[in-house]
Every structure is written in structure tokens, then in C-alpha cells.
Amino acid sequence: MASSSLPNLVPLGPESLRPFTRASLAAIERRALEEEARLQRNKQMEIQETERNARSDLEAGKNLPLIYGDPPPEVIGIPLEDLDPYYSNKKTFIVLNKGKAIFRFSATPALYMLSPFSIIRRSAIKVLIHSLFSMFIMITILPNCVVMTMSDPPPWPIHVENTFTGINTFESLIKMLARGFCIDDFTFLRDPWNWLDFSVIMMAYLTEFVDLGNISALRTFRVLRALKTITVIPGLKTIVGALIQSVKKLSDVMILTVFCLSVFALVGLQLFMGNLRQKCVRWPQPFNDTNTTWYGNDTWYSNDTWNSNDTWSSNDMWNSHESMASNYTFDWDAYINDEGNFYFLEGAKDALLCGNSSDAGHCPEGYKCIKTGRNPNYGYTSHDTFSWAFLALFRLMIQDYWENLFQLTLRAAGKTYMIFFVVIIFLGSFYLINLILAVVTMAYAEQNEATLAEDQEKEEEFQQMMEKFQKQQEELEKAKADQALEGGEAGGDPAHSKDCNGSLDTSPGEKGPPRQSCSADSGVSDAMEELEEAHQKCPPWWYKCAHKVLIWNCCTPWVKFKNIIHLIVMDPFVDLGITICIVLNTLFMAMEHYPMTEHFDKVLTVGNLVFTGIFTAEMVLKLIALDPYEYFQQGWNVFDSIIVTLSWVELGLVNVKGLSVLRSFRLVRSLKLAKSWPTLNMFIRIIGNSGGGLGNLTLVLAIIVVNFSVVGMQLFGKNYKECVCKNASDCALPRWKMCDFFHSFLIVLRILCGEWIEPMWGFMEVAGQAMFLTVLLMVMVNGNLVDLDLFLALLLNPLNSDNLSASDEDGEMNNLQISSWPIKLGICFANAFLLGLLHGKILSPKDIMLSLGDPGEAGEAGEAEESAPEDEKKEPPPEDDDKDLKKDNHILNHMGLVDGTPTSIELDHLNFINNPYLTIHVPIASEESDLEMPTEEETDTFSEPEDGKKPLQPLDGNSSVCSTADYKPPEEDPEEQAEENPEGEQPEECFTEACVQRFPCLSVDISQGRGKMWWTLRRACFKIVEHHWFKTFNSSLILLNSGTLAFEDIYIEQRRVIRTILEYADKVFTYIFIMEMLLKWVAYGFKVYFTNAWCWLDFLIVDVSIISLVANWLGYSELGPIKSLRTLRALRPLRALSRFEGMRVVVNALLGAIPSIMNVLLVCLIFWVIFSIMGVNLFAAKIYYFINTTTSERFDISGVNNKSECESLIHTGQVRWLNVKVNYDNVGLGYLSLLQVATFKGWMDIMYSAVDSREQEEQPQYEVNIYMYLYFVIFIIFGSFFTINSLIRLIIVNFNQQKKKLGGKDIFMTEEQKKYYNAMKKLGSKKPQKPIPRPQNKIQGMVYDFVTKQVFDITIMILICLNMVTMMVETDDQSQLKVDILYNINMVFIIVFTGECVLKMFALRQNYFTVGWNIFDFVVVILSIVGLALSDLIQKYFVSPTLFRVIRLARIGRVLRLIRGAKGIRTLLFALMMSLPALFNIGLLLILVMFIYSIFGMSNFAYVKKESGIDDMFNFETFGNSIICLFEITTSAGWDGLLNPILNSGPPDCDPTLENPGTSVRGDCGNPSIGICFFCSYIIISFLIVVNMYIAIILENFNVATEESSDPLGEDDFEIFFEKWEKFGPDATQFIDYSRLSDFVDTLQEPLRIAKPNKIKLITLDLPMVPGDKIHCLDILFALTKEVLGDSGEMDALKETMEEKFMAANPSKVSYEPITTTLKRKQEEVCAIKIQRAYRRHLLQRSVKQASYMYRHSQDGSGDGAPEKEGLIANTMSKMYGRENGNSGVQNKGEERGSTGDAGPTMGLTPINPSDSALPPSPPPGLPLHPGVKESLV
């Protein structure tokens, strides 16, 4: 019965769970034999069948699906037959535990002894599957982990360790007994997770019983036990499996990344080898002998004549002067290696670097730049060998503390080499790192889709089962009713009408099995109940109890009182009031600062008490109104109650020390704003989701962090204590160490945050390089991969992924929106009234209501006003009005902006007043709608206005009228605008209609008189401003004008001529731009000009120039306001935005995203305010310290404990009570601190101060408050990780939304059409090339054959790689012997490559230069020879010869020719090529932003004090230096160091009266407020917006590139086709002989190849043939393409398109008319053969008749009745067998001969086999006959 209705489903319930018996095993063996026989039979018959896969829902570890019902107790824990059909012929069985989890085992004997029926094995299985067993193992793992985290364990943990080892051994033994060891499937070692157990146990016994010397490393393996949590906790294995899959996908990116890094490292090695050892060394003091003074007079020393191109690196100079100081010995090497002679900056660990080029760093007076000592950072930062260069480049690509490497390199090598870093950052860091992101994204997306598909399948199955249950229940009820009816009619005993004891009754006339009545009824009911209960959160008794206790309806007065309270509390205005209170409460808490007056402190305390009272009252009233049962059903109410309770607890414990942190819980209340703020709501849901749905991934990350923390502590803890003096002169342990678990945990977290290079230097000093690098790499790869996956899971989570500002799911307005509606109405009313006054009309309230339209639109739709069109305004019947109202609201609430076009429809509100049933539609902006976009029909229905009511469209803010690049009249459609020619347009009206109505004199008649002259003038001006010459001239002037700003640096006062030129140029530019503005006013009119954003920008910038000009004339140029106004000149380059298409596109995209970006930024600010206020509570006034101003040393806490003790010493003048510059004394500075922590720049100082803090106004103490590290850890996770990644998510989603709105034509194509279209698009641009002809000369021909062989190319590639290897082995301090050897090897390579070049030129002659790669090789060879031959000359007079060595590296580019075979890498490079145009546009915008900010920086921060990050090279003094600084900050690197000096606002930090030589500007103080705004805005614009647009574009293009590469046919397939074609068609005629077609298609590569034998296949392709039996390449390619992609209806259209493209690409193609096709040709041949055969048969029959007649005639002599009296046969037969031949024997022979067909040749016919008379010839053996062909041939 169960399976009859749904035969495709497995039998229901417990009946499908059958015990596994010996009979079951025998049945499996029988099925296995049958399957083997069947497969053998299929193999012989060449029948292919699809592979069956195991069912995913019946995998081991998953729960038994619901369709099997609740398994009875007797089948729990015993072997059962496998439910999965896949295993029906495999020796497996399953066991279920009480939790219905499936365990699968092998049915073969375990350990060769224990069969599935053995008592020992069954017992082991019962233990293994028991939930308590896994619980016990989990409980043992946790204490084991705790013991391992002890840094100095007592002796007793050794016994604990042995206990854990014993438990693990017992677990493994149980598994082996239950499963078997390793031979079959599902045995112990077949599970990779068990390898972990096995290795841990083996290591434990090894260390216990075998003496292995230093076993600390082996003991570290014990930490792997913690990974067992992954095997025990359900779901974690799946997550780890998915992670491993994503690693597999990364192989191609990793190869490309390593290749690029190697090339960049080689470039770095050649450019900067040894540079970072150049230091400033004090020049030796003068010394005399008795006769000679040899210091001061010698020109080689004088500072004036010091040759800056020489580095002092030897003692040759001293030797040359030995005779002058014969009595004095001087050890030069010892002197220059003595660190005491190096120049150190204050507080620096390494000596100051310097360089010998003009733009490198220079030494102070008395010091010289000499190459000596070790490299910076313990000697680990250098380019001296390939390995260190590779590490440096890896660090640069990861962007970890790269500003340090950047500054060191530029100081040593020169600022010109900034170009090197720009290339690495943009190509390596932004592109390759984001490619890794893109690949993992795809892997995650695929995995997500698979999971969703599986869930969908389960859901469908569940629905199917529910339907089946319901159907069965209905049938049973019907049957019972029928039975009852029959029983009643028969008057029978009702007790006998049904049997409740499970007996079966069969309906009369029904065949088949008897039907179960009562037991089936109860079974179905139980199943239904079980399915329903599965969806309930709590057990049923809980609901009964809750209804009694938690619902308060005791008496009628109480219920009435409750209803009144409900009415008040649930009012939207109360909600609004509470929201305002939350905002005010947050503001009150944010007003705390230091120092704060006592009165202000009291005000804040009272305010907080009031707010606590308000929120308590709200909670109590809601409890009364809703009852606790309803109240606690809502998450927000639970949240409220927790916060209120904690507030009261905090008030009670206010004086308890250390519990002030409880105040922080009140801050969380501001998150309640999420209730009415969708973006904040989404943000909180994302975070909640990471703890819920993504909890497993978070747990895996936590396990990895804990594991590596313990590993680090075990491996390196002892080293730190023993080798601490290597790192610190005072032998004190550093802050970052692995001596205990907490510090080790912090270091692992720091590495995961991307800060690994600084800890690495210290660790390599104490722990050795190899060991730490291994651990570090493992932490980075494992941790960052999980981290990245977690990030992507958040980023790509389906939760609101397409809808960032979605409101509640039901689409209804929330209480805040409802309550704010009247307020918005009031504001609109006031606006309309004021506008009426301006227009000279006093409007009545009714008129204002009419003019307003729908007030909801102002609040909800923003830019677009939408309401119901006239044709919808029909009066619905009263009884349906509520339903219609709901329906209409539901549809129109979700209309939004359709296709990005704002619709505007006027609503006649009089109709609404007269018709109360008319629906008011409150639209919601598109980004707030939860529904999909309406279809075209819906759009037409709801948003198409009547013709007469279409309003005048305002000018699109994205178009640039002012730029004159894309000016169109405003009322036209965008499509029409794009198509029309702007030259033929007419100017618009000058003024708006309102202005003309107000001032009638503005209306001019343009048909006559002055009006006509005015119109003519306007048209002339219009033509001028629209002319492309005017635009070009204008753009050039803007660029020149912007360029002049770059010269206004600190040296402008000294360059009088340049200054004068700039002043005159500024005036000229101002006049020209005023003229341009006036021209545009006349041409466009005020209406158009002032309704365009770009024109407003122009207008404001020109205004600033005019004001500056007037102020100069009047002599007020030195006034403060005028000076600050001049700063705004930095905005001039913004005018270039509207002139350059590429930048404008990017800006338009950004402008479209700005509302959403601002929304999320605001959310981030709300989220950060919690941490900022918390920081103020925790650290305000606690991070001051006492310092000695002369030595900059801090006083110890034992000497000076607090501020009062400090103040008693301040009178000495050499000490100071100092605060950290970036601190938590108020919320604003707290925000700045958090920004530094979030960007990981400057955060160490903030964190150290916080951790050392004690109480207010007390001296800090080293790590006294160590757990304050957790504040920063929590902020980094929630404040930095989530907020910044949400912003990235927003930008990517917004980018995709805009792309959808402005989507291309692809949207209207099917997937199949896209494939065809892409294949044709690639194919169309190709054409067969004429190959280079082989020379006639014999020797040249031989060389030609040699150089065109593939082996020759591969050999050259190998030599190129070997050449790279020889360059890699170069080091800085290599011996002379090594130098000579490498020189000779390089010489050999140059000879080889020159030889290759010469040979190719000899063989290919002038054709050599027709190939791009050959020209590339030629240039490299020439430069290599020039560099070798003229190195001395070049070094002396021109550039460094290292540049020529770098040019040799260009040869490695040839290796890229080999990547045709590497499809994955080709896809990545293809994605880069596709991204380049968009990335170029973003790069332009970034350059513009950098330019503006560098000008602004020069004008504001040029003279700040040189300290921290600002020094003699990195500053804002010149334009070049500013650009270098801003490039650094683009990745948020080093901005804290640049900001610190700008925060100096007065003495003693800086001197406001300091004179700056060469200028009139005084002082070296900064402006903190301007500095903070400058850096924060730049970081947000560049780092968060522009850089993340890079990510969006790369993700998008990588997806496109992957789609392209996954197409069956790619560009390379077509390239290979034409390459092969060149060999078969050497004359490039585009035709091939039909006879050569078979060979040609056989030489192609898959998928286009048709392997031999292919004759019949080619015939079926039906290829057109032209005279001469030739076939065109296009026809062949098209046929092969169709063969690969399959046939479809669009093929003909696509073929035409392809031919058009090919004709365009191949103008030489001769038009041809095919005369036949290959199929027709074959059919013609077959027909000819058939006709021949038929005719032969006919002749044969006649010949036989004639022969018979002749035989008879020879016997009886009768001559009558001859069949052939005359003709060919008669004559021939007569000649051969006539009477003249004599006797009959001859005739007999003739008959025999004739009968066998030998007469044929004599009659001029081909001999034929009689068997051929019926059928055409068979194909050769081995060639299958194509069925279609066979039919046509026969």
C-alpha cells in the first residue's frame, strides 16, 4: 500500500529497515556477480551507461531521512541492510544510533577475523555508535587541550597525558574492531581523520618508550589531538572538506602568483642588490704625522667636491695615502663596521640609510654614505639574494608594513624607483590577491549552489511525503466512513465494522494486497504528528505550562487596564519617542570626556538615570500590555529586558572597583535602532548569522587559532626565554612572545590580521629561520584561507544580497515610518507654502494638498515620485475595498525604480477626497524593496503616465552639459539623445517658466528685431561650445591650469621667475574660464546651466578664482579667509572629471552608490560609537605618562607614581606629564583611535598604552591590565572585520545592481545563444595567415626546417629559464670567482640567443620582422650586447648598468607563449586583459584624487615639524613628495606616522614662531582638525571606495572569463585551427582540396578534431564544395563548431553573422558559388555505382541468355530464335564462341568463362563480383557505417 501511490519513492517507515543477515550477505554477493556479468556483456556490446552515484541524504554521518519514519527500538544498534541502492551490490551494511545517525561499515571480516555477525564486532559497533562514546571522547579532548595550554605545567600533567594516550588507544581499538584496519572501504585508515589519531598515538608511544633526544618537537604533535574536535562535532568535517576543495581550485592562481613574484623578485634583486646596506658613517677625524697634515687640503675629502655617484666600500683610498701617514696605522674595515660611527635617528634601531643618486637620501654634515654593516631589521630586509628579495616582494604584495620597505628602498635607491612599487602594488597586490578572492568566491558559490539544490531536493521530498500522508489519511477516513455507512445500513454491530487489533479487511472487488485499517490510520496520524512536531521549537508540555503561567487574564478590570496600556505602548508615536530617547541616551554617553567638570558629570549621571527609568517603564508597560508569553516571543523585547536588567545591576554595583565595564552594556541599546533602520538590521543579522549558520566555520577558525597558539608555545616558548638577549639589550622579554598561551594566541591573531613581518624578525632571531617560517606559512595559509572563506560567506550570503536596505519581510511600513509620516507631511506643507510666497501666491491648504502629491513619496521614494495613474482610479466595491487596498499597496510598495528610469505621475488628489475607496500608494525606493523588479507588463500597468501628464524630465545628473561632452536637450529620451547628432541641436530657454511668469520682461520674441539677433548670438555661442575643438582646447587649459598648482611648493619664493610666470598664467586662465562660463550662459541659458551638477562645479571653482583675483587687486591677498579660500584652488582638477569619459563613467557609478555607501558608513559609525564610548570609559586619563624631555626616557613607576608626584617635579623644566597623541579622552579621539586599529596602522602604541593603563592620572605599568588586549581583539572582529567587509559587500552588490539596471544585450539572450554568440564573436576576427615560405636555397631551407621545429622553441624556452636561474644565484657579496663564472655563463647565453636571432633572420629573411615575438627577441639581444660591451661607458656617463640587466629579464616574457596549454592560467590572464579598461578608468580617478590631495597637503602641511613619519624625504614640501606620501596611504599604510606631526598644535610640541628659511611662513605646527579630516577622508575615498571598486571589477571579469573558458569552444581552439590551416593551405587561398580534408581534421586538437577513420563523418557534415573539389575554411570551421555545440534553430542566423564578420576581416576573400556538397557528391558517386552495377547486371543477363542459345544451337544445330540477333553482345559472342572456334569443348569452356563474368573485359566492362550485384561495397574493416549514410547509399 505504501509504495503503490508513489512508486518512485522508497517504501515508507520501518518496513524498509531490515536486519543484515547471512542471507543478506549472500544476496549482495549474488548481485555483485550479476552486476559483473552485466558490465562484461555491456563492454562487449559497447553499450555505455551512466554511472550511479551514492545518495547524498544517506551518506555516513547524516541522519536518517524523515521518509523512513521513526525506526523501532529493535533496529537501533544492530547491522541493517544498506538503504542506498548504490551499495546494493557492495559488501556494506548500516547501523543506526538513537539519534537516527547513519553509520556505514564494510561487511567483510574486520582484521581478517571478525565477521559482521561476530559478537565482539557487534559489541564494538554498539560502543562506537553510542552518543555517550563520542561525548566521552569530546570531554577528554577539552581537558587535554587545557593541559597543553599550560606554559609551566606542574609534574602531575605527565600522568594526565598517559591517561589521555590510553583513552585515545582504547578509542582507536574500538574503531578497528568495529570497522577493520585498512583493506576495504569504511575501514579505520580509509578515513583520513583517523590518520590523525593514529599518528598522534604512534608519536605518544615513540616519545614514551624510545629515547629520541630532543623530543619537544615531537611532543608538539600532541596538539593535533585538538583537531579531533572536528571529527566529533557534527558538521565540521563537511566545512573542512569544502575548504580543501577551495584549495584545489587555487592551484592556478598560486602558480601565476609565484611566477609573478619570482619575476618581480629578480627585478628587485637586479635593481636594489646591496642598496639597503648603504649607511651614513661618520668621517674619520683629521690626524697628522710629523711632517704632513693630510686632512682639510685634500680635494677627495671636501664636501664640495664629493662625487655623489661613488659609494665608499673599500680601503683603497687609505692605502693610496699610506705614505702620508707612515707612522699611523688605521683599520678602515673595523672603523666602518663599528656601529658607534653610524648615524642613528632618535629612537631608531637601525642606522640611517642613504644613497648616491640625486633623489636618494643624503647624510648630515660630517657623515658619508658608505656600504657597510648588515641590512635593516636584524638583517632580514634586503634584496641581496633571491630568497630575501622574494620575501620582500611577498611582504609587499601582502601589504604588511610595506611602507617600511618602501621608505628604506627609496632612501637608498632614489625616488624614481617609486614606479617599481606602483607596478607591484597595482598588479601584484590589488590584482593577484583579489584573484585569489575571486577563485575562492567561485568555489564557495558552487558549493553554496550544491547545498541549496540538496536542500531544495529534501524540501520537495518532504512536501511529497506530506502530500502522500494526507492522501492516505483522506483515503482511510473515506474508507472508515464507507464502512460505518455500510455497517449502519446492514444494521450490523458497529463493533465489528472495523478491527482495531491490526487485522486486515479487504474491500469487495478490490484486487491486490489487503489494506490495513486501524493500524494504518494510527501510523499515518503518528507520522503526521511527528512531522509537525519536528517543526516545533519546544516540547508540547512547555506550551501548556506557558499558557497557564505567562498569560495574565485574571479579571475583567485587569484586561481592560491591559488593553488601555496596549493601546498606549503600541502606538507608533511611542515607538518614535523611545527611538529619540535611545539617540539622546547615546549622545549623553558620548559626551563623557576628560577633563570633565563635576557639574557636567552630575548632569550626565542624572540623564543616564532618567533614561534608565524611561526604558524600565517601557519594559514594564510592555510586559503588562503583551503578557510575558507574547513579550518574550519577540527578539527585540528579550534584548531590551537584558539591557534594562544589566543597567539596574550596574547601578547597584556602581562603587565596586572593576565593574565599571558593566556600563558598557547600556551602549548596546543603540543597536535597538536596527528595529527601524533596515541597514543596521541587515548588519546585525550578518553578525548573528556568523554565529548561527556560519558557526561551524567560525569554530574551525577558533580551533586553528588555538592549535597554532599551542604549537607556537611548545616550539618557541623555551627559545624566547633562553635567547631573549638577542632581541633586547636589557634582556627583557618583548611584548610579542610565545612564552604562554595568551601571548601565543595574540600573536596568531595578529598574523591572521595580516601583521606577520614584525613578529617574524624577532622570532627568526631567537628560534631559527626555517622552523619559524614553516609555522608562519602554515598559520597564514590555513588561517587566512578559513578567514577568507568566512569573509566570503558573509559577503555572498543570500541574506539580502541583492537588497541592501530591505525593510521588513512583509513589506509593510514599520512604526517609525508610520509615526514620521505626519511630520514629513508638515515639512512638505511648509515647503509648499514658502514656495507659494516666493512665486507671489498665497495658497490655501487645499491647494497646497493638491500641489504636494503623495507625502509618502517625499519620505520613501526619494528622487522618484510615483502614484496611481488615472486609468487605475476606479472605485472598487465597498466589500472588496480592504482586500484591494492591501493588494494595491503590496504591489506598488515594491515598484521602485524600473530599469533605472524614474517615473513621475501626477495624482489628482481631488479624486481621493471625493472617493474614499481610492488607494494611496506609498512607494518604496528600489533598494528598499524585497520583491524582484516588476515585469514589463507590470511596469506598463503601474508606471506609465498619460500623455498629457508626462512631466518635464530634469537633466540627468550623470550627463555633463557643462563639459559639452554629452549635452542633450533635457526633454528627449536617453536613447534618442544617444542617437542624435549634437551639432544640429538648438539652445534651450534661458530661464525657467516660474522666472518668466514672475518677470515678464524676460520673455523675448526671437522671430524679429533684437530678439532675433539675440537668438542668432545664442546659436553661434551654442555651436562654438559644442564644437570638438572648443572641448579639446578647454580640456587642455584645465590640465595646464591644474599643472601650475604643482609648482607652488616651499621653494616657490626662491624661484622668482617661475612665480611671476605662474601669477600671470593664473590670471590668464581665470579670464579664459570666465569667458567660457559667459559663453555657456549665453549658449545653454541659466536654466540648463544651473540644473547641471558639473556646471555648478565649474561655476564654484571659477568663483574662487575670481575672488582670489579681486583680493589680489585690492591688496587683501594675505588675509586669513582669502588664504584659506586659495586652498580651494586644489579643487580645480575636479573640472577634468566631466571632460574625460573614462573618469566620468567611474564617477557616475560611484555617485549612484553614494546613498548606499553613506548609509553603511553611518551604520559603521553607530557600531563604532559603542566601542568608542567603551574606550572612553576604560582608558580616559589613564594613558598619560611621565617623561624626561632631554633624554625622552620614561620614568619608572617606582620613582613617580601619579600626576601629583609628577607636578611636584615639573618646575625643573626637564620633565613633562604627557599624553599619547591618539587617545581615548573623548569620543572623537576614540573614533580616530579605532580607525587606526581597524586599519592596523599605529594601533600598537594605542594598544600598549591601554594594556599598561592603571587608574586615572596614574603612571602606566608594563602589562598590568593585560586582558585589555581582548577589547582590541573584539573590536577587530566586530568593528573592523564585519564593518569593512560589509562595506566591500555593499560596493560589490551596488556595482552589480547598477550593471543590472544598465545591463547590456546579453540579458535578452538564452544561455545557448550566448555560447554561440561568444564562439562566433571570437571566430569572426580570425583569418588564415599566409605562412612564411620555405627558402629555395638548400642551406637556408635546412636552417628554416631547424628553426621552425617545436623542439627548437622548447630548447630556447629551457635556456631562458636557465638564464633566469643564473640571475637568481647572484648575491651581493659574491666572490670574484663567482662573478667571473656568472659573467662567462651570461656571455654563453648572450651568444646562444644572438645565434638564435641570427639563424632565424638567415632562415626567415625579411619575414623575421613580421612576427612580434621576433622583434621582441631582437631588441632584447641588441640591448644585452650593448649593455655588455659598453657597461663601463654607460655607468660613467649615463645610467646604472643594472637597468640593462633588468632588460634581460624581459626575455622571461617569452615563457608566456607556453601558457597556451595551461588553461587555468590563461583564464586568469584573460580576466586581467578584460579588466584593464575599467581598471585604467579607476586608476585615472585615483590619480586625480591623489593630485587634488597632494596640492591640498602642500598648501597646509608643507612646514610641519619633521618627526615620526615626516622627514627630509617623505613630507608635503613638494608635489613629488606629496604624491609619494599619498601613494603610500592609498593602501592605508603609514598614515599614522604622517598624521602624528600634524597633531602638534602648539608648544612644547612645536614652535609657532619658528622661521622657515627662504619663505615668509612662520612656525612648524600642524592643524589637528584639518589633518584628521584630510587623512580620514582620503582613506575612505581611496582605500574603501576606489580600491574596492578594483575588487568588484576583478570579481566580475573573472566570472566572465571563467564562463568564456568553460565554453566548449575557446579562442585558442580557433587559433590552432588557423595555425594548422596554414600548413595545409600554404598560399592562404582559404580553400583546401577535398582529398586532404581527412588528414586536416585529424591533425586538429580536441574538441574540433575528428580522428581517423573519418571519411563517413566528413560526408555527413555536408560541406559545400566549389569547382576543383575545394572546400572553404569557414565552411569547415562552421561545420565543426556545429558538431561541438550541437544544432539549434539559431544556426542559420548565426552563420550569416559569422560570414559577414569574416568578410569584413578578410576583404581578399573571393565570392564563390558552391556547386555541390560532400554529401551530395557521395550520393552522386553511390548513384553512379548503382547505375553501373544495374547496367552490368543487365548485360550479364543478356550475355547468359545468348550463351545459352549458342550452346543449344551448337547441340541441335537450330539457328532460330536467337535472343541477340545483332548488336554488341551478338557480335562479341559470335567472335568468341562462334562456329569458327570449332568443337564443343571450346564452347563449353567459353560458357564457363562467360558464366563467371570473364566476358566483361572483352565487352569493355569492369569485372564484377556476383555478390556485388545486390549491395554497394562494404566499408573497410574497422570503419563503422554511419546509419544515416547507409540509408542514403542504399
Swiss-Prot record:
Paired cysteines (S-S): C280-C354, C363-C369, C725-C731, C1550-C1565
Cross-referenced Gene3D superfamilies: 1.10.287.70, EF-hand, iswi atpase, Voltage-gated potassium channels. Chain C
Catalytic activity: Na(+)(in) = Na(+)(out)
TM stretches of this protein: 132-150, 158-178, 193-210, 217-233, 253-272, 418-438, 573-591, 603-622, 637-656, 659-676, 693-711, 773-791, 1030-1047, 1061-1079, 1094-1112, 1121-1139, 1157-1176, 1267-1288, 1352-1369, 1381-1399, 1412-1429, 1443-1459, 1479-1496, 1572-1594
Pfam name, any one: Na_trans_assoc
Protein name: Sodium channel protein type 4 subunit alpha
Comment field on protein domains: The sequence contains 4 internal repeats, each with 5 hydrophobic segments (S1, S2, S3, S5, S6) and one positively charged segment (S4). Segments S4 are probably the voltage-sensors and are characterized by a series of positively charged amino acids at every third position.
